[in-house]
């Protein structure tokens, strides 16, 4: 019999022992889990739910293809195309087919202005995007200037959309934080983030998506150090893997969870990075997470244990609590 208080102290208040009604398998139930940074055109999304992921956020894809998806599990929120400076990242990348980026040529807020900030935000919104993805990658080409970034953020907020930024290169984290970007697509990895910027990011309720495990060497260390400082200051961290970048299996990543734990995001806070429904207000309805077998005895066992999770219909779960 699992001690409910001990289980919830380890994994959070919405966790409980349960079994599958159809075959009697015992395990642990949790809310639906989300990967907040994927690229669906580079992965087999059918593999996500059997490996624990009930919701994803696609942060850069063809808005036409994304708009024509059928509603299913995993639930998909998306940004549509990257908005970038002329000649900027990710244009020309072998993994970035035509149609997944738009070049913003002016900060114009005039409706329908060719290449204008408002026009391109509106295009993504009309294709059903709930977030806007901007590229601020000074390490790989031109970047949006402050006026254009400000115009994109303003138009997106008018449309009720979050703005997510890829920040890479000198000064890019500062540019994003000082100009109202809501979410960083990666914990900043190319330079240390100064304390004043961490404080400002937390004060403005910015979120950072982890993606620690895609890095190695100095980039990984900088990302982990920056994320640890952000989390320690009270910042909101979201679990994300940049799935599709490199050869990673779909599903809950033990490597990403271990990296988060090493950065000080542990226990219920770690689970919270996965169960946060952002950008939605609520998690997917009608499904839950089931992890077969006994739960871990300590926080260090969570990553490998949670990597065996699967998505199940909520009606198939029977609580074991008494």
Segments the model singles out, each with a brief description of its role:
Residues 27-28, 32, 152-164:
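Short beta-strand/loop segments at the ligand-binding rim of alpha/beta enzyme cores
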Residues 46-137, 141-157, 208-211:
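Divalent-metal coordination cores built from histidine and acidic residues
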Residues 69-73, 125-128, 196-204, 228-234:
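Acidic (Asp/Glu)-rich catalytic clusters
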Residues 32-38, 56-58, 76-80, 132-134, ...:
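Hydrophobic faces of well-ordered beta-strands that scaffold small-molecule active sites
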Residues 43-45, 119-120, 171-173, 193-197, ...:
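Short acidic active-site motifs
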Residues 222-298, 302-306, 310-320:
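His/Asp/Glu-enriched, well-ordered alpha-helical/loop segment
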Residues 52-53, 128, 177-184, 202-208, ...:
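Glycine-enriched alpha-helix->loop->beta-strand junction motifs that scaffold or abut catalytic
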